[in-house]
Amino acid sequence: MDSRCFGFFFTLLSLNVIVLAYDPDTLQDLCVADRTSGIKVNGFTCKPESNITASDFFFAGIGKPAVVNNTVGSAVTGANVEKIAGLNTLGVSLARIDYAPGGLNPPHTHPRATEVIFVLEGELDVGFITTANKLFAKTVKKGEVFVFPRGLIHYQKNNDKAKPASVISAFNSQLPGTQSIAATLFTATPAIPDHVLTTTFQIGTKEIEKIKSKFAPKKV
């Protein structure tokens, strides 16, 4: 193949890969999610336009702080296609994260989206880790913005041990997905074999079981 033709082909292929790396583009003005449909597609099927209302594009759930009542000290309120049906095929979503004093949003990833946070209140230590195990960390304050690249492990921690904090997160996916590193490893169903975890973390079975017990549902 002529080198110029190969170069042109490679460029087209690269552009195609980039385009396919995010949520697919919409092919019509509206494709409001029909969450009752049993049909499985990459996203949701569209409800009939005659059934679409303004409410399909509205959500009031991130206007005020969430109640934080867990051991890590943070609560995430999603504003994605599961809450706003009109986001289907649009490739964007939001979330609000509220932190108790000293609260942490533990290390996690979003496999389908880059995240941008805007600090509403407080001061947070934030950071992400590259595949080369390099940490990029920063302290961000009210009115400031920080970016977490798609798929990389990241975290946020409220610096203030006396006051709460909150951020708004924006994603370039209607449903970015979240995998908490610790919970994923220690609460998977079926469970990851203990010998995998003991070898990975270089600790004994008793320590593994102790960690798992921390994530077990609390008995009422």
From Swiss-Prot:
GO terms for cellular component: apoplast; plant-type cell wall. It comes from the Eukaryota. Coiled coil: none annotated. Glycans are attached at N51, N69. GO terms for molecular function: manganese ion binding. It is found in: Secreted, Extracellular space, Apoplast. Residues 58-209 form the Cupin type-1 domain. InterPro entries: Cupin_1, Germin, Germin_Mn-BS, RmlC-like_jellyroll, RmlC_Cupin_sf. Disulfide bonds join C31-C46. Oligomer (believed to be a pentamer but probably hexamer). Belongs to the germin family. May play a role in plant defense. Probably has no oxalate oxidase activity even if the active site is conserved. This is Germin-like protein subfamily 2 member 4. It comes from Arabidopsis thaliana (Mouse-ear cress). The gene is GLP10.
